Curated annotation (Swiss-Prot):
It comes from Cavia porcellus (Guinea pig). PANTHER family: LONG-CHAIN-FATTY-ACID--COA LIGASE, LONG-CHAIN-FATTY-ACID--COA LIGASE 1. It catalyses: a long-chain fatty acid + ATP + CoA = a long-chain fatty acyl-CoA + AMP + diphosphate; (5Z,8Z,11Z,14Z)-eicosatetraenoate + ATP + CoA = (5Z,8Z,11Z,14Z)-eicosatetraenoyl-CoA + AMP + diphosphate; 3,7,11,15-tetramethylhexadecanoate + ATP + CoA = phytanoyl-CoA + AMP + diphosphate; hexadecanoate + ATP + CoA = hexadecanoyl-CoA + AMP + diphosphate. This is Long-chain-fatty-acid--CoA ligase 1. The modification N-acetylmethionine is found at M1. Its cofactor is Mg(2+). GO terms for molecular function: arachidonate-CoA ligase activity; ATP binding; long-chain fatty acid-CoA ligase activity; phytanate-CoA ligase activity; pristanate-CoA ligase activity.
């Protein structure tokens, strides 16, 4: 066959030929083709699309040149950390001024009474009230200076933010107090920060402060401003010990009659003294500047700018304590974009009711809340069929997650997950978790079930809340993301625990404009946290993963040795054991003269009965806690999970004692940030510890 004949043989059909062929097809066939084409077009137009990552997810951080192994975010164009995202936002005063502009004086702060809708103050109203309060402070003789400290002793509410903005407008510094610190710690902070004025939300808190003055423990306190109504006896109690008790309304009136022009702060001025509740000793006052907060806020905006455009229509639910930098940072992000902040009623038991009423788009959480949500969802799947459906649906959505797809409109959302999403108000598009480790199983399931962008961050007060964050598009769990654009992270050797930076493991150290100035009037503690080159030593042990993300694998603090010389990090072990279904809390204990570990275990009151029943045990919660066979079964389950999680044999506990009462702030066994107070736990359970060591033979 000649070449031209071959080409003619394989030629494409002419349009006339196609028309002729189509005319010969039956009508049903043509309709089928049309339907198929329409369906294909519809699928192509509506198919779920993966969120485009802002960087190569296989390389989320890179080494900084000449920095001894420090890594930075690949979202940066150079080896200089990000300080500001918006040119006109350098301080927290600037943050609020920008919020006024971009919201067009929209709603700012909202609150509600029981069974009532939210009522809102506009941005201009908040500015007006804050300037009145700030002017009143000046009229009372306080200085518009970063050396002037103002105490706030209140739950989250609009007045909290108004008073804080008053401080920022006149270059004053906020010192938050919270009742779970305990009376002794509050007294310590009042004296350490030399607080002469404190804003309290309730008369009960004012009485706590007055009693301290009456007992000559806080002689410097001169004014208490009370937000809620109170009786004349409180005023009289104050007069007797030389303290003026005045209402917030009266302060507003005083400031309105003596209005002063704001005196905005500089970026390097102090903004907040955030006292961290240590597990031992007195709390430490972390000195946080305006630049610290704004740089951390800017880094969050930079990291999410392509995936999440925050705007004035967004609504944030405020229930995590404003006394902590985590909530402070998130509110900074919201106010900077003119968003709305709605406050919970003050009772965590009513949070779900508040969520339904507010319908937030932004929902910050902590692992405790996520664990509770996860447990309740699976507790409701109480039949084999329900559990199978839940598992099947979550697996389908988790497969989409691995492809980078985030959505809440799939068939599985409509059939299975819609109720869960509606319980949060039905409009959540962003969730952030931090403050403590979260199980990869819990995080992956809730990312799938809730169908929103769900970021995990890591940090501490001393780096203004966050130093690493998930990158948009990377919805894998088991790590805490890449360095935030405002800071570098490096790992340093911890030889006693056999962690070497050369092997990609070591203590996590942070450097950048978000790192604090030091601890208030405590150079010794400051020197322990900040080295001479400005690196913050976190006390956490991290590991670099191949894609440039950071995984927290251990804890340097609280480590101890067993008799054979093995180093033990109890918090790592506790975080593994609490994954056991019947376990709510664990305190792992060891001693240098003992060769093995033991633990005090608080069973989960909600799940213990059903878990025990499946294994043939019956009885009340207290009876099950006393049952030796139940204790043995719980220990076996803990050891199984420990083995699956890679615990070494010497890291496994050899015996446990069951305790029916939760460790709590009220009984003195937890800090206000829900961390174990290990010395107190040791003393409290001394008899059980001694008994375990005397009865267990290895």
């Amino acid at each position: 066959m000649q070449a031209h004949e071959l080409l003619q043989y394989f030629r494409l059909p002419e349009l006339v030929d196609i028309r002729q062929y189509v005319r010969t097809l039956p009508t049903n066939t043509l309709m089928g083709f049309g339907a198929f084409a329409a369906l294909t077009t519809f699928w192509y137009a509506t198919r779920p699309k993966a969120l485009k990552p802002p960087c190569d997810l296989s390389m989320q951080s890179v080494e900084v040149a000449g920095s001894d192994g420090a890594r930075r975010s690949t979202l940066l164009d150079s080896d200089e950390p990000l300080v500001y995202f918006y040119d006109d936002v350098r301080t927290l005063y600037d943050v609020f001024q920008r919020g006024i502009q971009v919201s067009n004086n929209g709603p700012c702060l909202g609150s509600r009474k029981p069974d009532q809708p939210y009522e809102w103050l506009s941005y201009k109203q908040v500015e007006d009230l804050s300037e009145c309060i700030g002017s009143a402070l000046l009229q009372k003789g306080f200085q518009a200076s970063p050396d002037q400290f103002i105490g706030i002793f209140a739950q989250n509410r609009p007045e909290w933010v108004i008073i804080e903005q008053a401080c920022f407008a006149y270059s004053m510094v906020v010192v938050p107090l919270y009742d779970t610190l305990g009376a002794d710690a509050i007294t310590y902070i009042v004296n350490k920060a030399e607080l002469s004025v404190i804003f309290a939300d309730k008369p009960e808190k004012a009485r706590i402060l007055l009693e301290s003055v009456e007992n000559k423990l806080t002689p410097g306190l001169k004014i208490i401003v009370v937000m809620d109504s109170y009786g004349s006896e409180l005023v009289e109690q104050g007069k007797k010990c030389g303290v003026e008790v005045i209402s917030l309304k009266a302060m507003e009136g005083l400031g309105r009659a003596n209005r002063r022009k704001p005196k905005p702060p500089e970026p390097d001025d102090l903004a907040v003294i955030c006292f961290t509740s240590g597990t031992t000793g007195n709390p430490k006052g972390a000195m946080i500047t305006h630049k610290n907060v704004v740089s951390d806020c800017s880094a969050f905006v930079k990291a999410t700018e392509k995936a999440l455009v925050l705007n004035a229509s967004d609504i944030h639910i405020s229930f995590l304590p404003l006394a902590h930098m985590y909530e402070q940072l998130l509110q900074c992000v919201m106010l900077c974009h003119g968003a709305k902040i709605g406050f919970f009623q003050g009772d965590i038991r009513l949070l779900m009711d508040d969520l339904k009423a507010l319908q937030p788009t932004i929902f910050p959480v902590v692992p405790r809340l996520l664990n509770r949500m996860f447990d309740r969802i699976f507790a409701q799947a109480n039949t084999t069929v329900k559990r199978w459906l839940l598992d099947f649906a979550s697996k389908r959505k988790e497969a989409e997650l691995r492809s980078g797809i985030i959505r809440n409109n799939s068939v599985w959302d409509k059939l299975i997950f819609h109720k869960i999403q509606s319980s949060l108000g039905g409009k959540v598009r962003l969730m952030v978790t931090g403050a403590a480790p979260v199980s990869a199983t819990v995080l992956t399931f809730l990312r799938a079930a809730l169908g929103c962008q769900f970021y995990e961050g890591y940090g501490q007060t001393e780096c203004t809340a966050g130093c690493s964050l998930s990158v948009p598009g990377d919805w894998t769990a088991g790590h805490v993301g890449a360095p935030m654009p405002c800071n570098f992270i490096k790992l340093v050797d911890v030889e006693e625990m056999n962690y070497m930076a050369a092997m990609g493991e070591g203590e996590v150290c942070v450097k950048g404009p978000n790192v604090f100035k030091g601890y208030l009037k405590d150079p010794a503690k400051t020197a322990e946290a900040l080295d001479k080159d400005g690196w913050l030593h976190t006390g956490d042990i991290g590991k670099w993963l191949p894609n440039g993300t950071l995984k927290i694998i251990d804890r340097k603090k609280h480590i101890f040795k067993l008799a054979q010389g093995e180093y033990i990090a109890p918090e790592k072990i506790e975080n593994i054991y609490v994954r056991s279904e019947p376990v709510a809390q664990v305190f792992v204990h060891g001693e240098s003269l003992q060769a093995f570990l033991i633990a005090i275990v608080v069973p989960d009151a909600e799940s213990l009965a059903s878990w025990a029943r499946k294994r043939g045990f019956e009885g009340s919660f207290e009876e099950l806690c006393r049952n030796k066979d139940v204790k043995k079964a719980i220990l076996e389950d803990m050891v199984r999970i420990g083995k699956d999680s890679g615990l070494k044999s010497f890291e496994q506990v050899r015996g446990i004692a069951l305790h029916p009462e939760l460790f709590s702030v009220d009984n003195g066994l937890l800090t206000p940030t829900m961390k174990a107070k290990r010395p107190e736990l040791r003393n409290y359970f001394r008899s059980q510890i001694d008994e375990l060591y005397s009865t267990i033979k290895v």
